Each structure stands twice: as structure tokens, then as C-alpha cells.
Amino acid sequence: PEAIDLLVNIDTLSIAKTLPNVRQIHTFSYKEKNENKFNQERKIINKIYRKYDLSINLTSSDRSVIYALLASKKSISAVEKNNLKAWWKKILLKYHFTYDLNSHILINNLKPLSLLGLNALNHQASPKLSEIAYSTIQDKLRKLKITKFIIFHPSAQYNYKVYDKKLRDDLLYLLNTLNISIIISGGKNEIDTKIKVSLPKLTNIYDFIGDTSIDEYICLSLLSEGYIGMDTLNMHIAASQNKRIFAIFGPTKLNMWSPWSNNLQTSAIEAKPIQTYDNITIFQADMPCVACGEKGCKNNGLVSECLSNISPSLIFKEIEEW
């Protein structure tokens, strides 16, 4: 195609900007939708209506399907397995595919290619690098005299996916004994800021929370020896770069959201206290409710008891033996 445009949630704009071959990015906001729904819809429709030869939608929500239908006469979209929800979408769309909750997100997202007669590579491409960001990170590491390091990413987008403070501190004290620098990464949001002010002061631990842009973090991840931390965007960036990963999972279901192995072209499927495939090790609690797929216990969006049942010593043992 001559040009590829994106329509994304504004919360994902920073990572969307790292994708190659994109001309422009349109955004929508749940906050703006709640404040003035029709104003946002009007602006989006004016921007996309019949502006494209082809539209591809990777989710099955009614709203996103309507955007795809409005953007192009030739539209492809995910639809639900439940025909009571999907019937009208199947009628109106040029092509459709089933969004499979039991398949990895990468596999789901590649399905439109087969509808276009293209062979998909089951490969998670890494984000493009910014030369300026790469130089900035190299200078920062040089000033701190850091040559080899592992990233520890303790935060996530939601509280229910964050490791308990006491357990996190215990893990940091253990990591501090390794003969390699540990860089703690994070952004500037409320969750990250709260973690930043509570970090223990340790000789081999370097706090980079709030100090890197997404472009700089991608470079930092590329230069690292590996990733330790929660199941979040940063983990998937590390997976795309084929880094050694030690991921701490709470209620998130593995079959869709576990780190993708480019070498094996697969991901984790079943819940286990510890499992390793290729360069990836995943830790989960040994509890019958794992993984529930809910937003924390009782779906409260705050706390996941399973995360409090993953031993820092167990995590450290795997890292130390590596």
C-alpha cells in the first residue's frame, strides 16, 4: 500500500509511534467518550469515513467494527464466536475472522493476512529504534559506569497486576547480591511513582523510573541482558528482542498474553508454578484459582492474592542459576 494509518486508544499512542511504515495515527479516548461521546465519534468519523481502500480491525467490539465498516468498503474484522453477537458483523463485513480467546494475541492479530492471501510469519517484530534515544541511553549508562545489566520492571498498568511491596523489596535485596547491575524501569504514572518513592536504597540497584521515554526504554531493553518483572508491555518488548525473560504473572491467562517465543513460535498455555520455554521463564502461584482471567480477586481491580503467593526466593533461584 502507499500508506498505512492507525486508529488506536490514546493510551497506546506512545508504543504505536514506534511501529514502522505508519503514515499517521488517529486516536480515541475512553475518557473523552465518557465526557462527550458524540463529539468524539463525530471527529473520528470525519477523519476516517471512506478514506481507505482497506480497513482491518483486530478486535471484535461493536464500536471498532463500526469504525472499520465506515473507513472502507472493503473491511476485515474480528468477530465473536457467539453468533448472537456476531451475526450482523458477518453480514456487513467483506471478510471476518473469529477472535479466539484461547489463542495467543499474536496469532489472532495475524489472521487477517490469510484472508488477503498473504503468508504470515509467526514472529513478533521488535519496535523500531530511535538513533537519538539509543545515543541518550548509551550516554546515561556510560556516566553510571554500567556495562552489563538486567532490567527489573515492577509496575503494570493496573494495581492488581503489581507484585506486593514487601515481596518486591525481598526480591530486590536478593537481586542486589548478583554480580550484575539491576536497572529498575517505569513511567511517570501514579503506580510507577508510588513504587519509585518506596524503593530500598541498594548499591547495585539503579532507579530509572520516570527517567526514560518509550523510545529510550526500547533501546535500554535492547542493551540489557534480560528482563525481570510483571506481565506488561515491557515484557512483550523484551520478548520481541529475544531477551531472557523472568515474568511474574498474576490472574492473566497465559494462552493469550504470555511472552511469545520467536525461536519456538509458541507461548505458554497451561498454568504452572514455574515453567520455562526457550528463553522465557514464567512464575505463577500454585493455587487452584490461577489463572482466573479476572481483574484481581472478586474482579475488584485492586488486589490479586495469587501474586502474594509467589516466593521471591523461588524467582531469585531461577535467575541465579541462569
Language-model features, listed with the residues they occupy:
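Catalytic machinery of carbohydrate-active enzymes
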Residues: 1-322
